[in-house]
Amino acid sequence: NIIVIQNETNLKNLKNLKEYTFDDLKIELKEFVTYYIFNNKNSNFPTSKFYELWESIFYSQNYNMKNFAHKDFEFVNLFFLKNYESHLQCGIIDFQSAFIGFTGWDLISLLENPRINFTRDYNDKLIEYFYDNTSIIENFNTFLEQYYVLSLARQTRLLGRWRKLLS
Protein backbone atom coordinates (compact mmCIF):
# COMPACT_ATOMS: atom_id res chain seq x y z
CA ASN A 1 0.00 0.00 0.00
CA ILE A 2 0.94 3.64 -0.21
CA ILE A 3 2.27 3.75 3.36
CA VAL A 4 4.50 0.73 2.82
CA ILE A 5 5.84 2.26 -0.39
CA GLN A 6 6.75 5.47 1.45
CA ASN A 7 8.30 3.67 4.41
CA GLU A 8 10.26 1.00 2.55
CA THR A 9 11.37 2.60 -0.70
CA ASN A 10 15.15 2.76 -0.91
CA LEU A 11 16.27 5.85 -2.81
CA LYS A 12 19.38 4.01 -4.00
CA ASN A 13 17.07 1.87 -6.14
CA LEU A 14 15.48 4.97 -7.63
CA LYS A 15 18.58 6.68 -8.95
CA ASN A 16 17.15 6.77 -12.49
CA LEU A 17 14.21 8.92 -11.40
CA LYS A 18 14.56 12.68 -11.49
CA GLU A 19 13.71 14.96 -8.61
CA TYR A 20 10.59 17.07 -9.04
CA THR A 21 11.36 20.80 -9.38
CA PHE A 22 9.51 24.03 -10.00
CA ASP A 23 10.30 23.64 -13.71
CA ASP A 24 8.22 20.44 -13.68
CA LEU A 25 5.39 22.22 -11.90
CA LYS A 26 5.53 25.07 -14.40
CA ILE A 27 5.17 22.63 -17.30
CA GLU A 28 2.08 21.21 -15.63
CA LEU A 29 0.60 24.63 -14.89
CA LYS A 30 1.14 25.52 -18.53
CA GLU A 31 -1.69 23.11 -19.38
CA PHE A 32 -4.04 25.39 -17.47
CA VAL A 33 -2.75 28.54 -19.16
CA THR A 34 -2.65 27.04 -22.65
CA TYR A 35 -5.93 25.18 -22.70
CA TYR A 36 -8.17 26.74 -20.07
CA ILE A 37 -7.24 30.42 -20.14
CA PHE A 38 -6.61 30.83 -23.86
CA ASN A 39 -9.53 28.60 -24.93
CA ASN A 40 -11.80 30.78 -22.81
CA LYS A 41 -10.56 33.80 -24.77
CA ASN A 42 -8.98 35.47 -21.74
CA SER A 43 -6.26 37.50 -23.44
CA ASN A 44 -5.77 39.73 -20.38
CA PHE A 45 -4.60 36.88 -18.17
CA PRO A 46 -1.33 37.88 -16.40
CA THR A 47 0.63 34.76 -17.39
CA SER A 48 4.01 35.96 -16.10
CA LYS A 49 2.52 36.99 -12.76
CA PHE A 50 0.69 33.64 -12.53
CA TYR A 51 3.98 31.73 -12.87
CA GLU A 52 5.79 34.13 -10.52
CA LEU A 53 3.17 33.58 -7.81
CA TRP A 54 3.35 29.81 -8.18
CA GLU A 55 7.15 29.92 -8.07
CA SER A 56 7.06 31.99 -4.89
CA ILE A 57 4.56 29.62 -3.29
CA PHE A 58 6.50 26.53 -4.38
CA TYR A 59 9.81 27.71 -2.93
CA SER A 60 8.22 29.07 0.25
CA GLN A 61 7.08 25.52 1.08
CA ASN A 62 10.64 24.20 1.37
CA TYR A 63 9.63 20.72 0.21
CA ASN A 64 11.64 17.67 1.18
CA MET A 65 11.69 16.09 -2.29
CA LYS A 66 13.24 12.80 -1.24
CA ASN A 67 10.47 10.24 -1.68
CA PHE A 68 9.18 8.02 -4.43
CA ALA A 69 6.10 9.44 -6.16
CA HIS A 70 4.22 7.37 -8.73
CA LYS A 71 2.33 10.55 -9.69
CA ASP A 72 -0.64 8.71 -11.18
CA PHE A 73 -1.53 6.65 -8.11
CA GLU A 74 -5.22 6.35 -8.90
CA PHE A 75 -7.66 3.49 -8.56
CA VAL A 76 -7.52 2.76 -12.30
CA ASN A 77 -3.80 2.01 -11.94
CA LEU A 78 -4.20 -0.36 -8.98
CA PHE A 79 -5.25 -3.97 -9.22
CA PHE A 80 -5.74 -6.94 -6.93
CA LEU A 81 -3.18 -9.78 -6.96
CA LYS A 82 -4.96 -12.69 -5.29
CA ASN A 83 -1.89 -14.96 -5.13
CA TYR A 84 0.02 -12.55 -2.86
CA GLU A 85 -0.38 -11.55 0.77
CA SER A 86 -0.69 -8.32 2.69
CA HIS A 87 0.35 -5.14 0.86
CA LEU A 88 1.78 -7.21 -2.02
CA GLN A 89 -1.80 -7.89 -3.14
CA CYS A 90 -1.94 -4.36 -4.52
CA GLY A 91 -0.44 -4.31 -8.00
CA ILE A 92 0.49 -0.95 -9.48
CA ILE A 93 0.85 -0.06 -13.18
CA ASP A 94 1.60 3.07 -15.23
CA PHE A 95 4.97 4.24 -13.87
CA GLN A 96 6.13 6.51 -16.73
CA SER A 97 5.55 9.71 -14.72
CA ALA A 98 7.26 8.54 -11.51
CA PHE A 99 9.81 10.83 -9.85
CA ILE A 100 11.45 11.67 -6.55
CA GLY A 101 9.25 14.20 -4.80
CA PHE A 102 6.86 15.12 -2.03
CA THR A 103 5.89 12.32 0.36
CA GLY A 104 2.18 12.95 0.04
CA TRP A 105 1.99 13.21 -3.74
CA ASP A 106 0.38 9.83 -4.30
CA LEU A 107 -2.05 10.49 -1.47
CA ILE A 108 -3.14 13.59 -3.38
CA SER A 109 -3.76 11.42 -6.46
CA LEU A 110 -6.00 9.11 -4.46
CA LEU A 111 -7.91 11.50 -2.24
CA GLU A 112 -8.18 14.67 -4.30
CA ASN A 113 -9.37 12.94 -7.45
CA PRO A 114 -12.25 14.99 -8.86
CA ARG A 115 -13.85 11.86 -10.32
CA ILE A 116 -14.25 10.36 -6.84
CA ASN A 117 -16.13 12.27 -4.19
CA PHE A 118 -14.89 11.46 -0.70
CA THR A 119 -16.07 13.77 2.06
CA ARG A 120 -13.61 16.33 3.38
CA ASP A 121 -13.86 14.70 6.82
CA TYR A 122 -12.99 11.28 5.36
CA ASN A 123 -10.03 12.74 3.46
CA ASP A 124 -8.79 14.54 6.57
CA LYS A 125 -8.83 11.31 8.56
CA LEU A 126 -6.93 9.46 5.83
CA ILE A 127 -4.38 12.26 5.53
CA GLU A 128 -3.78 12.14 9.28
CA TYR A 129 -3.56 8.33 9.21
CA PHE A 130 -1.00 8.51 6.39
CA TYR A 131 1.02 11.13 8.27
CA ASP A 132 0.97 9.14 11.52
CA ASN A 133 2.11 5.95 9.80
CA THR A 134 4.93 7.26 7.61
CA SER A 135 8.33 8.70 8.41
CA ILE A 136 7.54 12.30 7.55
CA ILE A 137 10.00 14.75 9.09
CA GLU A 138 7.85 17.88 8.75
CA ASN A 139 5.31 18.72 11.44
CA PHE A 140 1.72 17.92 10.55
CA ASN A 141 0.65 21.50 9.74
CA THR A 142 3.62 21.97 7.41
CA PHE A 143 2.86 18.66 5.70
CA LEU A 144 -0.79 19.64 5.35
CA GLU A 145 0.04 23.02 3.82
CA GLN A 146 2.44 21.40 1.34
CA TYR A 147 -0.18 18.78 0.54
CA TYR A 148 -2.83 21.38 -0.27
CA VAL A 149 -0.49 23.56 -2.34
CA LEU A 150 0.42 20.63 -4.59
CA SER A 151 -3.20 19.48 -4.65
CA LEU A 152 -4.24 22.93 -5.87
CA ALA A 153 -1.54 22.82 -8.54
CA ARG A 154 -2.80 19.42 -9.66
CA GLN A 155 -6.41 20.59 -9.86
CA THR A 156 -5.31 23.69 -11.78
CA ARG A 157 -3.51 21.51 -14.32
CA LEU A 158 -6.54 19.25 -14.62
CA LEU A 159 -8.79 22.21 -15.46
CA GLY A 160 -6.56 22.82 -18.45
CA ARG A 161 -6.45 19.17 -19.41
CA TRP A 162 -10.23 18.79 -19.28
CA ARG A 163 -10.74 22.01 -21.24
CA LYS A 164 -8.39 20.60 -23.88
CA LEU A 165 -10.53 17.46 -24.11
CA LEU A 166 -13.60 19.63 -24.75
CA SER A 167 -11.92 21.53 -27.59
Residue positions per predicted region:
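A cross-family kinase active-site recognition segment
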Residues: N1-N44, N64-K66, C90, F99
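Central P-loop NTPase core of STAND/AAA+ ATPases
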Residues: S43-L53
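Glycan-recognition and catalytic cores of secretory/periplasmic carbohydrate-active enzymes
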Residues: L11, K15, E19-K26, F75, ...
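Active-site acidic catalytic loop and adjacent metal/ATP-binding pocket
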Residues: I5, E55-L107, N117
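Active-site activation/catalytic loop segments of kinase-like enzymes and analogous catalytic loops
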Residues: K30-N40, I100-I137, L152-S167
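All-alpha amphipathic helical-bundle segments outside canonical DNA-binding/catalytic cores
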Residues: L17-D23, N139-S151
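Conserved short hydrophobic patches within well-ordered secondary structure
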Residues: T9, H70-K71, L159
